[in-house]
Regions:
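Short linear sequence motif anchored by a di-proline
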Residues: 1-209
């Protein structure tokens, strides 16, 4: 799972955050959802974040999006989508083919999970995880539009996959992280998501947070 990531406004992510905060519907989104437009620091589910997606002309743009797909009858939104089943799941199928996005982050957080002698899963130490030799973690995601009181706004979910060797010691899932060179292809309407994810990054570094 991926339920936390960090966006450092003092470094390479500032242009993305600035663009999202200045989007034409950003203020209305903040008011309608009663959420701040901070978009930096530790980002949690239901926060508004800066997300890369295609504009109407097909060009890359950055928009404010809320983290999590709302599901009728569920109190909490779905924040992750399993890459193995996203193309078939009714919740994500349309987004998989038509609405893909990228979440620029400094790193993501994960908590170590381990089994007790009695077989119970416990949560251990918190780790910051990012690609080796990269200042930006390009997290693959899906998005769609939801509506509240007549206001339509975008929401996103993070795609997850089986962990790389480096991550497998602390968790059984990790986000799909793209190389920078694949960002435009991933969000393109004519992109082939099954082919693009083959370039996903698995060489990651971890440190205790």
């Amino acid at each position: 799972m991926c339920t936390r990531y960090y966006a450092d406004i003092d470094k390479e992510l500032k242009p993305f955050i600035d663009e999202a905060q200045n989007a034409s519907f950003a203020q209305q989104m903040m008011i309608s959802l009663s959420r701040p437009l901070t978009m930096y620091g530790e980002i949690r589910p239901t926060d508004i974040a800066a997300v890369i997606a295609p504009a109407r002309n097909g060009q890359r743009a950055v928009f404010p999006m809320q983290w999590g797909f709302s599901i009728s009858g569920m109190k909490t939104p779905i924040v992750n989508a399993r890459i193995e089943s996203a193309a078939e799941k009714p919740t994500f199928r349309d987004s998989w083919y038509r609405r893909r996005c990228v979440i620029p982050a400094s790193w993501y957080y994960e908590w170590q999970h381990y089994k007790t002698p009695g077989g119970r899963t416990r949560t251990g130490e918190k780790y910051a995880i990012q690609p080796k030799d990269s200042d930006i973690t390009w997290i693959a995601g899906l998005y769609r539009f939801e509506e509240m009181n007549g206001f339509k706004y975008p929401v996103f979910a993070v795609l997850t996959r089986e962990p790389s060797e480096a991550v497998s010691g602390i968790h059984d899932r990790m986000p799909v992280i793209l190389p920078q060179s694949a960002v435009d292809d991933w969000i393109a309407l004519n992109g082939d998501p099954d082919e693009i994810v083959k370039s996903a990054i698995t060489d990651l570094v971890l440190e205790k947070a």
